[in-house]
Amino acid sequence: NSNLLLYGYGSYGNSMWPSFSSTRLSLINRDIIWATAHIRGGMERGMKWWKEGKLLNKKNTFQDYISCAKFLIDKKYTSKKKIIGMGGSAGGLLMGAVVNEKPDLFLGMIMAVPFVDSLTTNLDHSLPLTIGEFDEFGNAKENKEHFEYIYSYAPYNNIKKMDYPNILITTSLSDNRVLFDEPLKFTAKLRDNKTDNNLLLLKTEMNAGHGGKSGRDGIIEEI
C-alpha cells in the first residue's frame, strides 16, 4: 500500500518502454512507486495493440488504464487513497477521460498540456494539426459516427456535477500542438461543476511550448 504514480499515454502507436530518468529520483527517494501502463493505443504489443486503441476503439485505451490502476490496488501495491494518475498531451486526454469515468479511483491526477477539448479541435480543420489527426481519432466534421464517438469520451464535454480528486493541470502559452485555451476551458468548466473541496490547480508556463521550456537551464528550472 505505497504511494504510487501511474503514468499513461496510449496513442499514435508510441510505446512507453520502461526506462530510468533522473527526474524521478525525488519520487523514489520519498518511497513513491513509478508505474507505466502499457495500454492499447501504444504499440508495446505490436500493431494490433495500436489499432485496438484508435478511432472507434479509443475507449479501450481508457479501460486498459483503469484496469491497470485496479490491478495495482487489488494486488496491494497501492490504494485508492495513494494512487495518482499522470499523462501529458494525448496522455492528458487519457487522464481527462478516466477522471470523468472513475473519479473515486484516484487520489489525484496530473495532466500536462492535456488534449482535453478534443471534439472542438477535431471539428476545426483550420488548425494546423487537426487533419493529420484523422487517422488516429477520426473526422468528426464529416462522419457522424466519429462525432458521436468522440463526443462520448471528450473530457471537456463529459465533465459532470460530482466529486473529483485533486487535479493539477499544466499548459504553455506558446504550445502550438495543444493550444492553451483547451486546458483553461477544461479547468473553468471543472471548477464550475465539481462538488468537492479537493485541489484544482492550473499552472501556465508563459515562455514554453508543448515540450516545456527549452535549453538546459529551462528544463532544470521546470524540474
Question: Over which residues does each language-model region extend?
Answer:
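Short amphipathic alpha-helix adjacent to the substrate-entry channel of hydrolases
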Residues: 18-38
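Short beta-strand segments enriched for Tyr within beta-sheet-rich domains
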Residues: 2, 32, 105-107
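Active-site-proximal cap/loop segments of hydrolase catalytic domains
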Residues: 39-223
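Short beta-strand element of the alpha/beta-hydrolase
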Residues: 2-11
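Alpha-helical transmission elements in cytosolic ATPase-linked domains
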Residues: 7, 19-22, 101, 185
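Glycine/threonine-rich flexible loop motifs
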Residues: 13-19, 44
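Amphipathic coiled-coil/heptad-repeat helices and related helical stalk/stem segments
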Residues: 5, 20, 152-155
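Acidic helix/loop microenvironments that form the catalytic cleft of cell-wall polysaccharide enzymes
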Residues: 10-12, 90-91
